[in-house]
């Protein structure tokens, strides 16, 4: 699921951390990767890729990782990408936070 925000008042790093996300890594594509556990185990978890341009516009890609990679050396995993259920609720919470950040 893709979310776009014009001229964010705060950085994606700060906003997502306030929402309980942990920074995971920088990607080769120049994105920041964040994860947020749904329960006590490593999976399932929300996974967000974030990129901000020079004008402050933010592009997020959100999905739900159901489990880790099923074989060594692979990044492929089972995930949900559609706009429904728990993923839609998380997207709405992210939209609310990006539109009205607590500075």
For the regions a protein language model found, what residue spans apply to each?
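A structural detector for beta-sheet-dominated domains
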Residues: 4-6, 37, 63
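C-terminal basic regulatory modules in eukaryotic proteins
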Residues: 49-103
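Terminal, regulation- and interaction-focused segments at domain boundaries
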Residues: 1-18, 99-103
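Ser/Thr-rich, low-complexity intrinsically disordered terminal regions
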Residues: 10-47, 54
């Amino acid at each position: 699921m893709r979310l776009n925000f014009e001229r964010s008042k705060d950085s994606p790093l700060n906003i997502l951390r306030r929402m309980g996300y942990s920074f995971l890594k920088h990607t080769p594509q120049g994105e920041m990767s964040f994860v947020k556990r749904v329960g006590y185990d490593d999976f399932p978890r929300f996974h967000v890729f974030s990129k901000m341009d020079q004008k402050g516009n933010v592009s997020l890609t959100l999905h739900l990782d159901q489990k880790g990679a099923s074989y060594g050396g692979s990044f492929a995993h089972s995930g949900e990408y559609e706009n429904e259920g728990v993923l839609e609720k998380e997207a709405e919470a992210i939209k609310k936070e990006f539109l009205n950040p607590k500075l």
